[in-house]
């Protein structure tokens, strides 16, 4: 819920969420953003719910997909429909510390320079082409404080990066 998105919010056509009770649904409603919320368990297969996602995205003429907190690996159903048009945010300086526990893994490893990466999504976990990165030094010893610092860096970077991508379209 970063400020300063301007035209990015105005152009957002659809918010897709795989968690029916998630607070992000309320946020989207507050901004007047249409939402497709689904429960993956209600579909016979991953391919079925991903086909429905693609159908809805196409119906809204979505050109760019921006993932945030979507903790599922996208299959070729979505990747082929939106090749080079899906971006994700990751809480490490990729290619280091891929996966869902990047902050904890980097902290446990003793890293002193942390960061955030915005990247295109491809078939490899956190393996797409890097669009933007921002690093910062952290010498503290509190993992919760580190996580808060990561989020303080990633939100503005994602807003800036998405705004640039939208402006280029």
Where are these regions (language model features)?
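Short, surface-exposed acidic-centric catalytic microdomains
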Residues: 10-52
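Short phosphate-binding loop-to-helix
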Residues: 41-67, 72
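Short, structured coil segments at secondary-structure junctions
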Residues: 4, 31-32, 82
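Donor/substrate-binding cores of folate-linked one-carbon enzymes
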Residues: 18, 64, 68-169
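Single conserved hydrophobic/aromatic residue that forms the stacking wall/gate
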Residues: 1-9
């Amino acid at each position: 819920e970063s400020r300063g998105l301007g035209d990015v919010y105005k152009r957002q056509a659809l918010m897709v969420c795989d968690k029916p009770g998630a607070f992000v649904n309320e946020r989207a409603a507050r901004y007047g953003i249409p939402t497709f919320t689904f429960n993956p368990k209600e579909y016979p297969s991953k391919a079925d719910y991903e086909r429905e996602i693609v159908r809805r995205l196409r119906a809204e003429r979505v050109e760019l997909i921006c993932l945030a907190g979507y903790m599922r690996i996208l299959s070729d159903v979505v990747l082929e429909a939106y090749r080079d048009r899906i971006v994700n945010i990751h809480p490490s300086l990729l290619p280091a510390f891929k996966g869902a526990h990047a902050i904890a893994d980097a902290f446990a490893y003793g890293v002193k320079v942390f960061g955030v990466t915005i990247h295109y999504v491809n078939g490899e976990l956190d393996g797409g082409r890097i669009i933007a990165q921002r690093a910062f030094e952290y010498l503290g010893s509190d993992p919760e404080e580190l996580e808060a610092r990561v989020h303080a860096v990633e939100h503005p970077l994602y807003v800036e990066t998405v705004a640039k991508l939208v402006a280029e379209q």
